[in-house]
């Protein structure tokens, strides 16, 4: 039995609370168990310089963690004057994941920036951020459609993410911090609602994993992401 008393194929309790903040065009509090992330989507009527005059938009993301989102206080990155490599890697991953399901031509010459701020961390902050960011993005696009600023919806599909790993030789879904810090293999999987893979990040922590292990982990991730997409759909209809 896992420390959380979950079955190997069981997600933590997942919730998407929409319209969580007042000012953003899209905002969501996403919870994966004790991991909680606020995702806000901001529409900007401009694009980065490399896209000016090209008739297409852009979707990007920023990621950060509050100082006491973890067991002991982390120093704010702003205080050191630069972002860590981990932060840069995660926010690029979130942006890539969102762009995979957006028709940037249909978005027009505007940019949507999704900020993902971790307020409490218990493992899986990047996968929770991606799953919540999609809901915030979808709400922001709904607002553009309602105002008549878009003639076609540029959102092609859902995107969601989950972690999987090998713990004591067993594939498990949605690792919390305790499992993540002691697992043999850690993998983050990003998929679309139609089952396409956007990104797979997998690392062995000392014990190599086999091809059979990888297939089992991907099957488990597919099952979990289908459930998360269903929860995204339910949240969007509420």
Swiss-Prot record:
It comes from the Bacteria. This is Ribonuclease PH. It is an enzyme of class 2 (transferase). Phosphorolytic 3'-5' exoribonuclease that plays an important role in tRNA 3'-end maturation. Removes nucleotide residues following the 3'-CCA terminus of tRNAs; can also add nucleotides to the ends of RNA molecules by using nucleoside diphosphates as substrates, but this may not be physiologically important. Probably plays a role in initiation of 16S rRNA degradation (leading to ribosome degradation) during starvation. Phosphate binds at residues 86, 124-126. Belongs to the RNase PH family. Transmembrane segments: none annotated. The keyword rRNA processing applies.
């Amino acid at each position: 039995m896992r420390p959380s008393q979950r079955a190997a194929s069981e997600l933590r309790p997942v919730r998407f609370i929409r319209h969580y903040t007042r000012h953003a065009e899209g905002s969501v509090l996403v919870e994966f168990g004790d991991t909680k992330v606020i995702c806000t989507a901001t529409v900007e009527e401009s694009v980065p310089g490399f896209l000016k005059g090209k008739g297409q938009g852009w979707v990007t993301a920023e990621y950060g963690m509050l100082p006491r989102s973890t067991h002991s206080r982390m120093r704010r990155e702003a205080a050191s004057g630069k972002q860590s490599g981990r932060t840069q890697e995660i926010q690029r991953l979130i942006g890539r994941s969102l762009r995979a399901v957006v028709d940037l031509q249909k978005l027009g010459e505007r940019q949507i920036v999704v900020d993902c701020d971790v307020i409490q961390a218990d493992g899986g902050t990047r996968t929770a951020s991606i799953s919540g960011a999609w809901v915030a993005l979808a709400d922001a696009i709904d607002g553009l459609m309602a105002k008549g600023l878009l003639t076609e919806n540029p959102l092609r599909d859902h995107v969601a993410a989950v972690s999987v790993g090998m713990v004591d030789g067993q594939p498990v879904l949605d690792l919390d911090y305790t499992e993540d810090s002691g697992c043999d293999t850690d993998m983050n999987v990003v998929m679309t609602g139609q089952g396409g893979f956007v990104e797979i990040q997998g690392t062995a922590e000392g014990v190599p994993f086999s091809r059979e292990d990888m297939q089992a982990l991907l099957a488990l991730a597919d099952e979990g992401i289908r459930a998360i997409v269903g929860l995204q759909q339910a949240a969007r209809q509420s």
